[in-house]
């Protein structure tokens, strides 16, 4: 599977890291389904920029299975082919600001449930919607976006980190289940990225602290992170599944 003309779904693809992922795939010639929940204006502006023959703005709440199925059907009707690459990037609104996070003392089950719904249930809904088309095509790539925080919780975002750790477990069990159909499932785990919507509230001293802890001496960019998604979407990764690749400049070595 080469990326050119491949139908790629990026959930949460209109802003933040998702926008960089959508752009990266479009630059390689893919046809991109830019999913969004509430960022209608940004999604349509991005699609207009990428070209309406190459991109489709698709509103859906990924936590709603029926909305996801409808979105996948619309994408197939629009492009005339099934989605064969799905990037589960959508995130419940979250600000990476350690000063504003709930400490363990104040963490609630509702905090955990909200993040679990976005990260795990959302990814499950997407996988269930796209895998029939992938099986029909004889191949597919599912790429889940994780975090290095469950290996190195430099800031203890309890709810977000726990949900992403659960997503890693689902990544590996799904890889086992879907492998016979020619579908690979992998995770890319970044650290702090400079800069996305989610990290916009991060103080400069935190960026400096993270950069000082990496062999490269800098914070990873969204563009560098997106490059790894291109690898997992291509034939270069055809022998790789069930893996978690950390892209954080070497802050975590695992």
Question: Model segments located where?
Answer:
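Short, small/polar-rich loop/turn modules that mediate ligand/substrate recognition or access, typified
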Residues: 179, 184, 240-242, 248
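A short, exposed helix-loop element centered on a Lys and neighboring polar residues
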Residues: 127-128, 172
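A glycine/serine/threonine-rich, flexible loop-to-helix segment
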Residues: 46, 100, 159, 180, ...
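The beta1-alpha1 cofactor-binding region of Rossmann-like NAD(H)/NADP(H)-dependent oxidoreductases
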Residues: 40, 59-72, 109, 223
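Conserved glycine-rich cofactor-binding loop
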Residues: 7, 14-15
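Alpha-helical segment proximal to the catalytic Tyr-Lys
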Residues: 132, 176-177, 238
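Catalytic loop of short-chain dehydrogenase/reductase
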Residues: 92-96, 103-115, 141-166, 171-180, ...
